[in-house]
Amino acid sequence: MVSSSTTVPRSGVYYFSQGWKLVTLPGIRRFVILPLLVNIVLMGGAFWWLFTQLDAWIPSLMSHVPDWLQWLSYLLWPIAVISVLLVFGYFFSTLANWIAAPFNGLLAEQLEARLTGATPPDTGILGIMKDVPRIMKREWQKLAWYLPRAIVLLILYFIPGIGQTIAPVLWFLFSAWMLAIQYCDYPFDNHKVPFKTMRAALRTQKVANMQFGALTSLFTMIPVLNLFIMPVAVCGATAMWVDCWRAKHALWK
C-alpha cells in the first residue's frame, strides 16, 4: 500500500496497478460506487452502440487511404479500428468524468486521508454541492486546454496517408497525457492547486505520467474492463499524488 512515508516515486505502471488494489480497501469502496455507476451506464451504453456502427465506419475511414498505400491495407485496417476506439473512448471517458467529477474528487480526498492519516475538510452531500461550481470551472479549464489540440489532431485524420499512419500514434500519445492530467487533477484540485501549476508538476514526472495515461487509455478501449477504469484511475492517480507531489502542494496535512 502507498503511504505518506514513501519518498521515491515509482513508475506509472506501478501506480496503475495500485489503483486496482486501492478501490477494494474497506472504507473506500463506498466512495467508489457512484463513479463506478456513472462509468458503467455511460461507457457501457456508448461502446455497445459503437460496436454496432463499426462495420459502416471502418470502410468509410479506409476509403481515404491513397492508392499508393493500398498494399498496406491489411495493416491499416486494425490501425483504423484502434483509432476509432481511441477517439471514441476518450470522448466518452471525458464526458463520464464531467458527470462524475464531484464524486471522483471525494474519492480522491478520502483515499488520500486513508493513505496519509491526514484529516480532510468536512465532506458530505452539502460539501459536494458547495464545491460543484469550483469543480465544474476546473473541468472547463481542462476542456479549454484540450480542445484546440484535439481539433488539430482530428484534422490530421482527414489527410490521406497521415490520417491512417501517423495520426493514430499522435492521438494515442496525446490521449495518454490528457488522461494523466484528467485523473491526477482530482487530488491537486482538492488542495486548490492552480491548473497551470498542476501541469508543471506533472511534467516533473513525465515518463511515469505517460505510462499511467497510456495504460488508462488502453483499458478504456477494452470492453468490460473499461467499465471499471474511472475509479481505478482516480485511486492510482491519488497514490501518485501522495508519493510525488503532496509534500510540496498539500493544503491540509
From Swiss-Prot:
It holds the Pfam family EI24. GO terms for cellular component: plasma membrane. One of its GO terms (biological process) is cysteine biosynthetic process. It comes from the Bacteria. It is a multi-pass membrane protein. The chain crosses the membrane at residues 31-51, 72-92, 151-171, 222-242. This is Sulfate transporter CysZ. The lineage of its organism: Bacteria, Pseudomonadati, Pseudomonadota, Gammaproteobacteria, Enterobacterales. The gene is cysZ.
